Amino acid sequence: MATYGQNCARPMCIPPSYADLGKAARDIFNKGFGFGLVKLDVKTKSCSGVEFSTSGSSNTDTGKVTGTLETKYKWCEYGLTFTEKWNTDNTLGTEIAIEDQICQGLKLTFDTTFSPNTGKKSGKIKSSYKRECINLGCDVDFDFAGPAIHGSAVFGYEGWLAGYQMTFDSAKSKLTRNNFAVGYRTGDFQLHTNVNDGTEFGGSIYQKVCEDLDTSVNLAWTSGTNCTRFGIAAKYQLDPTASISAKVNNSSLIGVGYTQTLRPGVKLTLSALVDGKSINAGGHKLGLALELEA
């Protein structure tokens, strides 16, 4: 049994935020796939410490091309992060965040967006506080009709997790979101269940079977319907530079992805989605993504 002396701090166990509950299982389903898209991501960093991120994608079905540009500068001495964003919808965004300065574990963020074409403006203040066994969050969306308040809390103890998430619309004076979640996690196993607004029920299981193989199961059901959604996914690391991912759901949609690191900072991902119910009818999707980082 481990013991902790006066000069040896007990290891911290900070639970994830509510949005990150079940994230390990979702990542197996989502990462390594990009059906119907041709995508390019580029990340660079200047000598002065400014980070540049650009992303562009083309939808193979509609032909629509979208892109984003983001610049980020971290002033580590004061715990400040400045972020500027732009996208092809001509929406400009500015974000200022300060972390671990007012008190340890507290992060405050001021986020604004502006669309010159429509004149639409929005503002949001985000706050999060995380310490051992607790992770709290509170965001305020400012609107002319009245602000909306988003709150969340996750508590953890010896691997067990319990969370609550809500949204209060001050314009309507009522709760518009009321979610609960319970989970359990260890180093190679995670279980997550959730209830959204008393009508949507979901659960997921993540397990690291061995060093190279990760698996995930996802289940969802909405009350008042006979529709149950079920999926299985897996990721296998072929070697240090290549991995293959596969997933299938109860709608007979089969997805396969292959990721290869061509050289340090260059990663290629190929993916395909096949409709198992109509293999000969067409409608299948392919995807290609290239990530560059320097």
Swiss-Prot record:
The chain crosses the membrane at residues 37-46, 50-58, 65-75, 80-87, 91-100, 106-115, 122-131, 134-141, 148-156, 161-169, 174-186, 189-196, 200-209, 213-222, 229-238, 242-249, 253-262, 265-274, 284-293. There is a cross-link at K31, K64, K120, K121, K172, K277 (Glycyl lysine isopeptide (Lys-Gly) (interchain with G-Cter in ubiquitin)). CDD domains: Porin3_VDAC. GO terms for cellular component: membrane; mitochondrial outer membrane; mitochondrion; pore complex; sperm midpiece. Its main location: mitochondrion. NAD(+) binds at L253, I254, G255, S271, A272, L273, V274, D275. The modification Phosphothreonine is found at T118. The modification N6-acetyllysine is found at K31, K120, K277. GO terms for molecular function: ATP binding; ceramide binding; cholesterol binding; oxysterol binding; phosphatidylcholine binding; porin activity; voltage-gated monoatomic anion channel activity; voltage-gated monoatomic ion channel activity. Keywords: Acetylation, ATP-binding, Ion transport, Isopeptide bond, Lipid transport, Lipid-binding, Membrane, Mitochondrion, Mitochondrion outer membrane, NAD, Nucleotide-binding, Phosphoprotein, Porin, Transmembrane, Transmembrane beta strand, Transport, Ubl conjugation. The modification Phosphoserine is found at S251. ATP binds at K23, K31. It catalyses: chloride(in) = chloride(out); K(+)(in) = K(+)(out); a 1,2-diacyl-sn-glycero-3-phospho-L-serine(in) = a 1,2-diacyl-sn-glycero-3-phospho-L-serine(out); a 1,2-diacyl-sn-glycero-3-phosphocholine(in) = a 1,2-diacyl-sn-glycero-3-phosphocholine(out). The modification Phosphotyrosine is found at Y78. GO terms for biological process: lipid transport; mitochondrial outer membrane permeabilization; monoatomic anion transport. InterPro entries: Porin_dom_sf, Porin_Euk, Porin_Euk/Tom40. The modification N6-succinyllysine is found at K31. Consists mainly of a membrane-spanning beta-barrel formed by 19 beta-strands. Monomer, homodimer and higher order oligomers; formation of higher order structures is necessary for scramblase activity. Interacts with ARMC12 in a TBC1D21-dependent manner. Interacts with KLC3. Interacts with SPATA33. Interacts with PPP3CC in a SPATA33-dependent manner. Belongs to the eukaryotic mitochondrial porin family. Non-selective voltage-gated ion channel that mediates the transport of anions and cations through the mitochondrion outer membrane and plasma membrane. The channel adopts an open conformation at zero mV and a closed conformation at both positive and negative potentials. There are two populations of channels; the main that functions in a lower open-state conductance with lower ion selectivity, that switch, in a voltage-dependent manner, from the open to a low-conducting 'closed' state and the other that has a normal ion selectivity in the typical high conductance, 'open' state. This is Non-selective voltage-gated ion channel VDAC2. It comes from Bos taurus. The lineage of its organism: Eukaryota, Metazoa, Chordata, Craniata, Vertebrata. The gene is VDAC2.
